[in-house]
């Protein structure tokens, strides 16, 4: 988002003609699903509120018509939580969640996914997607892990920038970076709690993804519910004005999260009444308030009383109008696509490609792929035929009462349906086995499941969690499989048949026992419309898996947090009562082929603190299957004035290699990539030796060195 000189003149002229009330209305977003006093929603439509949330189709058209009848005729901007596709619209493409798509490590596909989502959202009459989520999921007890790109700063920045480019490249919608900032690091993994972090840590760990996405053209940012070191993010002037505006040069607008201004009073207690809270939010740098219906009257009153400088209001309104002009909302210049693009064949194909690359093979004792279709396959487990569990959060039914019925579109594939599609000549027998959380029907279901396993040639066991265990206000104390799922796995194992376990879940779970019982293990996370089909294709060997984990799997909940980029301690990951290390590391994922790395080299042995250099490595597919490999590059500062993590991801490249083919992969880097944020808040690359590691996973890295003068 950059200023356009011609539009800036129009904005200044428009603001000069607006009354105070009209300006403040631009700073307010209202939803048709929030609880307000009777008539409030209609009043704001008639008055000309600046933004509307989750107002779709004909309802949005009616709001636009009402805005055109106001004195200033300023069009509203319509927002939607399109987190993994325009999934609140039944019939639109539902892609894998961010955590799922992050397993692809494929920027090109994720950019295409962003563009496809933008086209579907635009065709539905909307302008603004509340995505991407740039929080880091490093304590996976937190309920919103599935919404993130995983645990790593660098990977999140790269993938976030890709999806922003996809959203905004054709001017169809704007993106919204959230949640600013450090929200995923809340104490104890408890949603919206305080994040215990210094500003140095914020700059080092949480800020870079936002900086990358701002460079990519992001037009809006949403502040987080929580706080940093005791200062609420909705009231953090340093982060919103000094860093976001002055340092990063952000020129779009900032919106609060849902009713965040109220939380300054009720939860965080930094304001005693709504007037004080609203003033604090606006002066700190929030341009738009989401859903606090008293906001407009409060701000107008305080400006008239001299408690808020009107120039602050003018600045906020200019930030909002800048985006509206860029979108073409004025003068009938808005680009709208036909509704026929929604779930069009091109978008479905993008979803198929992305879903295939988002599945991660975690274990394979040689049973996969199934080259010959088994005569009889038992598909067992609570998530084998549960599309709600497979979709995850932020879809059209995920926030509705369980009793309501929603027809599922025909192109959705659970694992059960996928297996029937891909193995048409096999007899497919289904048994639920148990529920995710346990209920009175489990005993009978388990008996049926064991019988099905005994009579089958192979078992596809589908376990995990569901929407009741993920999302806002759904943080977990333990990540072990719930209900009787472990018991089900043991009983199926006792049947003596090969087991391919498929995990359908919103976060890494503690599945060590299940992994040991299984002959193969596949992680799908929440894989969207085509997850079950692509899983069955993987099992059949229709394609070669290439996904790798963007997040670490603990052996037990007591190891949390277990992210890879930790500072060294005396015993590193070790606890006295559990095996050292993670169950599955960040960056891990198996293939049906094997890759051999060799000839790691740097273009220069010594560089200046601001000098470019290259890192090259040879990769050969030494197996019998064509495939795609993700080469991961990590760095380590051997001696630094403050502690630095054991390793940090600083590059990756995904390449296609035919069986027997060899390629050179080159990473283009700068000495600044080796540096860190000092206690003065500035990035520095100190002189000395740096180690550079490249390989296919953290456990198989080649090493070289480079020296900074």
PLM-predicted stretches and their roles:
Residues 1-677, 684-698, 705-709:
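Glycoside hydrolase catalytic-domain context in secreted enzymes
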């Amino acid at each position: 988002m950059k200023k356009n000189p011609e539009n800036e003149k129009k904005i200044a002229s428009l603001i000069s003609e607006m009354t105070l009330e009209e300006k403040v209305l631009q700073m307010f977003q209202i939803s048709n699903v929030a609880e307000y006093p009777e008539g409030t929603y209609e009043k704001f439509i008639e008055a000309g509120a600046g933004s509307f949330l989750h107002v779709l189709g004909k309802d949005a058209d009616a709001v636009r018509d009402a805005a055109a009848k106001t004195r200033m005729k300023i069009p509203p901007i319509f927002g939607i939580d399109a987190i993994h596709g325009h999934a609140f619209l039944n019939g639109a493409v539902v892609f894998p969640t961010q955590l799922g798509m992050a397993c692809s490590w494929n920027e090109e596909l994720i950019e295409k996914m962003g563009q496809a989502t933008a086209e579907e959202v635009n065709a539905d009459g909307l302008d603004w997607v509340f995505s991407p989520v740039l929080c880091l999921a490093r304590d996976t007890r937190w309920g919103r892990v599935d919404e993130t790109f995983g645990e790593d700063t660098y990977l999140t920045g790269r993938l976030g920038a890709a999806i922003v480019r996809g959203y905004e490249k054709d001017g169809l919608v704007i993106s919204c970076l959230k949640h600013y900032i450090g929200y995923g690091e809340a104490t104890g993994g408890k949603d919206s709690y305080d994040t215990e972090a210094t500003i140095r840590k914020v700059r080092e760990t949480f800020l870079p993804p936002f900086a990358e996405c701002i460079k990519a053209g992001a037009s809006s940012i949403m502040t987080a519910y929580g706080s940093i070191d005791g200062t609420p993010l909705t009231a953090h002037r340093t982060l919103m004005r000094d860093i976001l505006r002055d340092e990063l040069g952000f020129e779009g607008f900032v919106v609060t999260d849902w009713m965040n201004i109220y939380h300054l009073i009720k939860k965080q207690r930094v304001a005693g009444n709504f007037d004080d809270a609203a003033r604090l939010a606006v002066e700190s740098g929030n341009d738009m308030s989401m859903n606090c219906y008293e906001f407009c009257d409060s701000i107008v009153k305080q400006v008239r009383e001299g408690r808020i400088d009107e120039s602050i209001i003018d600045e906020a309104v200019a930030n909002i109008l800048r985006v509206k002009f860029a979108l073409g909302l004025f003068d009938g210049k808005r680009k709208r696509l036909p509704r026929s693009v929604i779930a069009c064949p091109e978008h479905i194909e993008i979803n198929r490609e992305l879903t295939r690359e988002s599945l991660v093979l975690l274990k394979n004792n040689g049973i996969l792929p199934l080259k010959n279709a088994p005569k009889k396959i038992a598909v067992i487990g609570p998530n084998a035929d549960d599309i709600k569990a497979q979709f995850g959060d932020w879809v059209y039914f995920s926030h509705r009462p369980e009793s309501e019925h929603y027809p599922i579109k025909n192109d959705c594939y659970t694992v059960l349906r996928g297996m029937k599609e891909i193995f048409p000549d096999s007899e497919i027998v289904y048994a639920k086995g148990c529920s995710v959380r346990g209920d009175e029907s489990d005993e009978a279901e388990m008996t049926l499941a064991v019988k099905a396993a005994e009579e089958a040639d192979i078992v596809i066991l589908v376990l995990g969690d569901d929407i009741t265990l993920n999302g806002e206000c759904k943080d977990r104390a333990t990540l072990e499989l719930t209900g009787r799922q472990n018991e089900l796995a043991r009983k199926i194992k006792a049947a003596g048949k090969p087991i391919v376990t498929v995990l359908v879940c919103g976060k890494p779970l503690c599945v060590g026992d299940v992994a040991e019982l299984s002959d193969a293990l596949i992680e799908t996370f929440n894989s969207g419309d085509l997850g079950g089909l692509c899983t069955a294709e993987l099992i059949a060997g229709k394609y070669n898996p290439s996904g790798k984990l963007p997040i670490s799997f603990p052996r037990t909940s007591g190891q949390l947090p277990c992210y890879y980029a930790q500072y060294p301690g005396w015993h590193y990951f070790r606890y006295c009562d559990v095996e050292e290390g993670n169950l599955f590391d960040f960056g891990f994922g198996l293939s049906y082929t094997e890759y051999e790395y060799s000839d790691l080299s740097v273009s220069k042995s010594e560089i200046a603190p601001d000098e470019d250099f290259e890192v090259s490595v040879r990769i050969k597919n030494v197996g019998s299957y064509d495939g795609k490999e993700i080469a991961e590059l990590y760095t380590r500062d051997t001696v630094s004035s403050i502690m630095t993590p054991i390793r940090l991801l600083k590059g990756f490249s995904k390449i296609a290699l035919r069986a027997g083919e060899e390629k050179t992969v080159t990473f283009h880097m700068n000495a600044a990539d080796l540096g860190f944020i000092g206690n003065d808040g500035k990035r520095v690359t100190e002189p000395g030796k740096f180690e550079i590691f490249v390989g296919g996973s953290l456990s198989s890295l080649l090493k070289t060195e480079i020296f900074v003068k």
